Amino acid sequence: MKVKVLVAAHKQFPMPADPVYMPVLVGAVKNYKAGIAYQRDDEGDNISAKNPYYSELTGVYWAWKNLKDVDAIGLVHYRRYFYVSKPHDLDHVAKGVDYEHFLADHDVIVPKKRNYYIESNYDHYVHAHPAEPLDKTREII
């Protein structure tokens, strides 16, 4: 099984060494700076310009449209990984063989449930995004 795990990033940052990980510069149409050698989400078929509205999903769209010969595509944030042991640092992130093992028996890998009571999903969203699209969606529903 060929697995690629996109590491969505908007800036240069330390990355895992395992080749299963593919750093993707999301919003590259705006975020690119000389010297960032990540796969850019503004190449090939892309929606990079929509990154302010879709965040890391512009990288997923890029992978969906442009990655070939891959059986499974994953997504992690440049500071949030799946770890196989402690301490939670780049030396202990899941490797390609770990993902293949997990996916042999499961269709999807997700993190442990997190109980987040500080604010609602709505409040959390509007702290980082314009409220209007979410408000319009609520109206329509």
What residue spans do the PLM features occupy?
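ER/Golgi luminal nucleotide-sugar-dependent glycosyltransferases, focusing on the catalytic module
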Residues: 1-141
